[in-house]
Amino acid sequence: MLAMAASAEETNRQSNAGRRSVISPSEAPPEAEQSDVYQAPPPGLKEWLFILILCSTQLFVQGAFGYILIPLHIVGQTFGQGPSEATRMTWHVGGYSLTVGTFILIAGKLGDLYGSKRILVLGWAWFGVWSVIGGCSAFTHSPVFFDTARALQGIGPALLLPNALAIAGRTYPPGKKKNMIFSAFAVAAPLGCFTAGVVGSVFAQYVWWPWVMWTYSIGCFIIAAVGLWVIPSDYPRCQKAATLQFDYIGSVLGVAGLLLLNISWNQAPIDGWSTPYVYVLLIGGFLVLGLFELQERRAPGIRSWINFAMCLLWIQQCSSRQGPSQGILPALATPYLMAVITSGWLMAIACAAFLGGCILQSTAPVEQSYWMNTFWSFVIMAWGMDISFPASTTILSDAVPVKHQGASASLVNTVINYSIAIGLGIAGTVEAEVSHQGVNQLRGYRAALWSSVGLAALAFGIALVFAVCTFQEQRSSRKSSQEREQRACIEGCILGLTLTPDREWERVELGRLLSHVSQTGGLRSQSV
C-alpha cells in the first residue's frame, strides 16, 4: 500500500508539472520557461479586437493574392502585356507568393526569439509600405519594377502569418475555444481572397487598379496601430541567449534554396528549360536545399496546395470567372470534425477533396455552365483547404511547447504559400510545353489541370498511408495502456493482501490471474 501511495503521489506530481498555467506577462518571472506558461488574453472588448486582428492577417495576406490575380489581364495591360504573355504575368502573382512562402521559414522563429508582437507590428508596417510602392509602380510601366515591389511586399505577410498563429497558440490552451479561433483564421483565407478579388476587379474596371493596393495599405497601417494597443506584450527573455539559439546557417540555406528553386520554375515557362541559367538555378536550388536538409533534417510535403494554385490560375485565365466564398462553411465545420475524427483521417479527407475537385476541373467541357463542374470543384476543394489548414495548425500548436509556437506556425504556412508560388511555375511550364507556346491554349490548360490531378492523387496516397499507420499506432498504444493499467491494478491488490495474512487464498488467485495476463497479453472478460 505504501508503494501504491508513493506511485500515486509521483503521478500527481508529474501531472501538475505538465499542466500549463495561464498568467499575465507581468506576473511571469524573467526566467520563466515559456513552455509552461500561457499568456492571458486581453479582457472584455479588447479580446474581440485581439482575435479580429489575428484573423485579419489571413484576410489581408490572401487578399493581396486575390486583388491582383482576378484582374490580372487588366494589370498586365498597364505594363504592355497582352494575352500572349500570360506566362510572364504569372510573376505578378508568383513573386508575391514566392517571398511569402520563403521568408515564413524564418519569420516564426524570429518571433519566438524576439517577440511575436514586435514582428507582427513590423510585418503590418512593411506590408503597408510596399503596398503603396507596388501601386505606384503603375507610373513606371515597368513589369520588372512591379514584380520586385510585389516580391518585397510579400515579406510583410511572411512576418504576419506565423506570428499571428504563434500569439494565438501562446494565449489559448488546447480546447474548443482554440479550435474555433484557428478555424476562424482559416475562414479568413477564402473570404479575403474572394472579397479582395471583387474589390480589385471593381477598382480595375471602373477606377484604376493601383487604388486597391493603396486602400489595403491604409488598412495595414491602422491594424498596426491598433495591434500595439490590443496585443499583450511578450514575455521578457535574455536577448543574448536568444540570439545564440538562432540557426543562421540553416536560415540562409533554406531561404536561398527555396528562392532558387522557385525562380527557375517560374522562369521556365518564359525562357524555356533549354536556357542555361534556368536549369543552373534549378540544380543550384536542389543542391542548396540538400545542404539545408543536412542542417535541419526537415522536409515537409507540399503537393496538395500546389494543385489548388494551378486550378485557380488557369480556371481564371480560361473562363474569366471567380469562385465564390465556398470555403467559409468547411472552415467553420472543422472544429467539430476534429472532435470526432483523428488527424490522420482528416488529412486523408482533405487530400481526397483536392483530388475530386481537380478531376472535376480537368474533365469540364469548354461550353459547360459555370454551375456544373467548375462551381462544384470549388466547393469540394474548399473542404480540402479548410480542413487541412486549421487541422494541421491546431495539431502542431498543441504538440509543441509554447516557446516554439512561431516555428510550428512557420512550418504550416511555408508549405501552403510556397506551394502556391511554385505551383504556378509548374503549371506554367506544363502549359507552355504542351500548348507549343500558345498555339493550342486549351490543350495546354488541360495538361496543367491534369498535372494537378496527378499531384493530388500522390498526396492522397501518402495521406491514406499516414492515416492507416496512425490508426494502427493509436490502437496499439491503447492496448498497451490498458495492459499496463490491468497489471498495475493486480500488483497493487497483491501488495495490499500481503499485509493481511489471513487472505492467502485471494493472493494465490490474483497471482494466477497476473500470470495469465503476462502469458496472454491482457485480461479476458471472463477473468475480470
Curated annotation (Swiss-Prot):
It comes from the Eukaryota. Its main location: membrane. Keywords: Cell membrane, Glycoprotein, Membrane, Transmembrane, Transmembrane helix, Transport. GO terms for molecular function: transmembrane transporter activity. The chain crosses the membrane at residues 50-70, 91-111, 119-139, 149-169, 180-200, 211-231, 241-261, 272-292, 340-360, 375-395, 410-430, 448-468. It holds the Pfam family MFS_1. Glycans are attached at N262. It is found in: Cell membrane. Induction: Expression is increased in clinical azole-resistant isolates and by the presence of itraconazole. Expression is down-regulated by tetrandrine and posaconazole in a synergistic manner. Expression is also induced upon amphotericin B treatment. Residues 1-37 are annotated as: Disordered. It is a multi-pass membrane protein. GO terms for cellular component: membrane; plasma membrane. InterPro entries: MFS (IPR011701), MFS_dom (IPR020846), MFS_trans_sf (IPR036259). Belongs to the major facilitator superfamily. Major facilitator superfamily transporter that confers resistance to azoles such as itraconazole. This is Major facilitator superfamily multidrug transporter mdr3. It comes from Aspergillus fumigatus (strain ATCC MYA-4609 / CBS 101355 / FGSC A1100 / Af293) (Neosartorya fumigata). The lineage of its organism: Eukaryota, Fungi, Dikarya, Ascomycota, Pezizomycotina.
